Amino acid sequence: MEQQSDGLKVMVIDDSKTIRRTAETLLKKVGCDVITAIDGFDALAKIADTHPNIIFVDIMMPRLDGYQTCALIKNNSAFKSTPVIMLSSKDGLFDKAKGRIVGSDQYLTKPFSKEELLGAIKAHVPSFTPVDAVS
């Protein structure tokens, strides 16, 4: 498997295989190194091993939900400055507020577009320059 050492490390945590694959495909096309996790427990071990530059996390997941996962990331001194973007099919004010309380940096509603994903990355990792994908 080819490793892009200069690619931005992006983690996508979602229990939906479709969402993980979609995000992974979109992000790899612009030069990102994508790490996926199926839930918060899976993600925490991978975060410690890979040190992603930005993390996208679904809210509604079994075992350890997105709010709990975000809080654990933000309470860890090694990762508290890592941007965490919440992903949810809900677009409610309460959900967004709860995300802010646990330390999330942004909130994206699913389904998301390539532009929304890249916009979130650019907003929180200003040095990121997407590679132009060949159509």
Swiss-Prot record:
The keyword Phosphoprotein applies. Residues 9-125 form the Response regulatory domain. Disruption phenotype: Deletion results in decreased cAMP, surface piliation, and twitching motility. Supplementation of pilG mutant with exogenous cAMP restores surface piliation but not twitching motility, suggesting that PilG regulates pilus biogenesis and function by at least two pathways. One of its GO terms (biological process) is phosphorelay signal transduction system. The modification 4-aspartylphosphate is found at D58. It comes from the Bacteria. SMART domains: REC. Gene3D superfamilies: 3.40.50.2300. The keyword rRNA processing does not apply. Transmembrane segments: none annotated. Phosphorylated. PANTHER family: PROTEIN PILG, STRESS RESPONSE REGULATOR PROTEIN 1. Plays an essential role in both cAMP-dependent and independent regulation of twitching motility. Regulates the cAMP-independent coordination of type IV pilus (T4P) biogenesis and retraction that plays a role in surface and host cell adhesion, colonization, biofilm maturation, virulence, and twitching. In addition, phosphorylated PilG is necessary for cAMP production via regulation of the adenylate cyclase CyaB. Acts therefore as a response regulator of the chemosensory system/Chp system. This is Protein PilG. It comes from Pseudomonas aeruginosa (strain ATCC 15692 / DSM 22644 / CIP 104116 / JCM 14847 / LMG 12228 / 1C / PRS 101 / PAO1). The gene is pilG.
